[in-house]
Amino acid sequence: MQQSSELFFASSNNHKFEEAQRILSNLGLEINMFKTTLEEIQSNSMNEIAKRKALDAFRKIKKPVIIEDDGLFIESLDGFPGPYSSYVYDTIGNKGIMRLLENIETRNAKFVAIIAYCNGDDDVQLFESSIPGKISLSIEEGGWGYDPIFIPDGESKTYANVSDKDKFSHRSASLKKFSDWFMHTQLDSGL
């Protein structure tokens, strides 16, 4: 098992860290939080945003680090807010998203998550997953971020109210891809 002092999760978001820690721990990988505010470039490319954040995090901590970036892509809004999800949430929130979707029947959406790993060189590894779903008709209680309005396919409740979000969330799927790669890489390098 990877020692917790050797791998860090960089974020200013405690919710993201707690979710990542819980998921990775269940996969046999321990992480520590590196609480920091990372450079958040504005780009149409989530990959570019994730790479820049991972490089920024490594420059600050000088240790192997992962970051997570995600976006909510709403079909009827041409993928908006997409890579601008964090900014949009901070400015208009879930109420603003619901106003944009007033009188719109097609509420299909997907959540995309990217885990980016950097260990010092400029070769950032990316692990992406997406979960299809739809936007609810109302804002549910609980959860954080867009959880109260996103209903994953096959569910009748939003992320905020499903019993085990970790089993099928976009973040969980990306973290699993990262964990599989990281554990395999560690075994290959003899660490």
Task: Show which residues each predicted segment covers.
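Anionic-ligand binding patches
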Residues: 2-8, 15-191
